């Protein structure tokens, strides 16, 4: 039994798979936030500038592209954080697009990190690696995105709506809680702006989140 466990640990180590909070809770989430910031968030900023200053190139050309590429940007960032082989990184672009389409940024995150790890497991294990590795990564990732995505997206939207409604009903206490939580997130290696974007916070809740920054 011990030999089997040792063999399993050695195999996972060889594949660069580390089951730890540091890897999935810090590294992956931090990279996801970077991917989200480099696509959707920066696109939102440029869209606002383009709208206010009447620059159609920013609001009508760059903004739609940046929004559509949010999932792929998140996926590539996560795959690189997990030190995935090139074939897995390239394949994750499709996974990220599907995950974001059906489940938003969180859907892209879950679909990508699971499929990337599976892709790493099969990478270079067969003589037709160029077929097997992308196929495993894409099929598992897109399946996860389409299967789990809608439920994840519904939960995130509902959670965001609950926070905004609660902040409207109890602006002082809920505003304080939201601002404190966002302030705490600022001390972590993830983006507080990305968190607020995932929850679609607006109105009083959005203002409280801004105060927390």
Give the role of each language-model region.
Residues 2-213:
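Pore-lining transmembrane helices
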């Amino acid at each position: 039994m011990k030999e089997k466990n040792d063999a399993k640990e050695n195999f996972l180590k060889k594949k660069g798979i580390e089951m730890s909070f540091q890897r999935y809770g810090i590294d992956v989430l931090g990279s996801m936030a970077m991917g989200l910031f480099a696509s959707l968030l920066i696109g939102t900023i440029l869209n606002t500038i383009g709208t206010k200053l009447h620059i159609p190139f920013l609001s009508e050309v760059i903004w739609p592209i940046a929004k559509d590429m949010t999932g792929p940007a998140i996926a590539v960032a996560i795959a690189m954080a997990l030190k995935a082989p090139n074939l897995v990184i390239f394949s994750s672009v499709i996974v990220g697009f599907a995950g974001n389409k059906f489940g938003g940024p969180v859907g892209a995150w879950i679909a990508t990190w699971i499929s990337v790890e599976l892709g790493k497991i099969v990478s270079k294990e067969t003589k037709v690696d160029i077929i097997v590795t992308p196929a495993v990564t894409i099929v598992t990732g897109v399946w996860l995105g389409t299967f789990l995505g809608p439920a994840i997206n519904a939960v995130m939207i509902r959670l965001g709506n609950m926070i905004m409604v609660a902040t409207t009903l109890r602006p002082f206490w809920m505003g304080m809680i939201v601002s404190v939580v966002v302030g705490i997130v600022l001390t972590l290696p993830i983006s507080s702006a990305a968190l607020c974007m995932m929850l679609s916070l607006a109105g009083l809740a959005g203002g409280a989140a801004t105060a927390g920054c």
